[in-house]
Amino acid sequence: GDTPAEERFRTDVARAACFAALPTDWTRHVTVLAGDLSAPDLGLSAADRATLTAVTHIVHSAASVSFDLPAAEAARANIHTSLHLLAMARGCPALERFVYVSTAYVTPHRGARVPITETLVPLPAPAAELLARIDAGAPDAELLALTGHPNTYTLTKCLAEHLLVERRGTVPLSIVRPSIISAARALPFPGWIDSTAGFGAFVMLLGLGHLRAVVGDPEAQLDLVPVDEVTQRIAHA
């Protein structure tokens, strides 16, 4: 949007209920930089890039979570941004950890009760080749049929994992794969959530009475994970 990054932080982030228990001056420890992850050098000024070389930890959680973006747009949002950030990370000599927040759904559906391992998901072709096909305008239906992914979101998150691992060099990379993130179990307080994305909207519609019944499978498992457990895992990745 047109609202400056610093202003959005002050009005939308700093006032969030999840930070209410922190000291009143906690924001003095936060430096907001205006940039663009989709641009080379993250769209940052030379001075801001120099500032970032001192960071010790990078958490990359930015992404487009839209399931129906054209593959080329999803790749710009989820793959190229990740590679731009990795390039910046290589210039951070004090870096201790680069955490990439992925998704449990990088593994396409393979039938009931097939174990999902903490390894890269096999691809039908090298990740760089698949990305080149996306950038060249290959039809979405062709890409999804080839890889088994149900949508361009999971496909591009999967390719981002592969390319980060392949190109990380000496960057200390960790990947965290949460499933559907939902309300907090304990922190900042039980039930806290500030987003209607994902399961939050579903619960809100049920609670308000707008959604009275849904077709479901009583044997199916709903893959939800509390947001505070996800943040703890990211912090210790």
For each predicted feature, which ranges?
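A structural motif corresponding to the C-terminal end of an alpha-helix
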Residues: 24-30, 88-95, 160-172
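NAD(P)-dependent short-chain dehydrogenase/reductase
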Residues: 114-137, 152-154, 158, 162-223, ...
